[in-house]
Design a protein with these regions (language model features):
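Active-site-adjacent segment of FAD-dependent monooxygenases/related oxidoreductases
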Residues: 1
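Conserved beta-loop-beta/alpha segment of the NTase-like Rossmann-fold superfamily
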Residues: 4, 11-93
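Short secondary-structure junctions
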Residues: 8-10, 98
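Catalytic-core segments of class I nucleotidyltransferases/pyrophosphorylases
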Residues: 62-66, 97-165, 169-181
């Protein structure tokens, strides 16, 4: 599995949008497509967007995706309506299969929020152009997952720990204090 990340990194198989490997399209879904084309990627992909710090390993998420043999998203419980309205919300059946996927819903059907962490099967990555031609948004990284969930079975892995979104200096300072203990 290859890893695509929008945050700067130095790993061998990580392709940040500011890496100089390609000029970003300034639209997350198009950036994924561009990286796949420029790097000639034909493998399953782990895609992550945003400035996040996790207190858990991603290895179980990747294992889950391989076991389910579908593209997968990660999710966590979010019970605050205002936060639900600013993110993707999904519902699941008893086997973790996504039954609905809404981007920034005014009236959410569920309470499982989807951060920008996705495992895409290689066969699904090949469908990005089809998605873009059929109404998938170009910008938000979750647009492709939302579109794909209506085209093919997708599963969701419940986040086993905490995710810290570093959106400003205050959240950065908070995360520093959490991890320095």
């Amino acid at each position: 599995m290859k890893i695509l990340s929008a945050a700067p990194n130095t790993g061998n198989n990580i392709c940040p949008t500011n890496s100089g490997i390609f000029k970003p399209a300034k639209a997350a879904v198009k950036d994924i497509q561009l990286a796949v084309e420029k790097l000639n990627l034909a493998d399953d992909l782990l895609v992550m967007a945003g400035d996040n710090v996790l207190d858990f390993s991603l290895s179980k998420f990747v294992k889950f995706a391989k076991e389910k043999n579908t593209s997968c998203v990660m999710c966590h419980e979010e019970n605050e309506l205002k936060k639900q309205q600013k993110t993707a919300i999904i519902t699941l059946d008893g086997n973790d299969l996504i039954t609905s996927y809404e981007e920034k819903p005014k009236e959410p059907k569920g309470n499982l929020a989807v951060p920008p962490f996705y495992c895409y099967r290689a066969c699904d990555v090949k469908r990005i152009q089809e998605a873009l031609e059929n109404g998938c948004g170009y910008d938000a990284p979750g647009s492709f997952a939302a579109w794909l969930s209506k085209q093919a079975p997708m599963h969701a892995y419940v986040m086993p720990g905490k995710r810290y979104d570093i959106g400003d200096i205050n959240s950065y300072e908070y995360v520093k204090s959490v991890f320095s203990k």
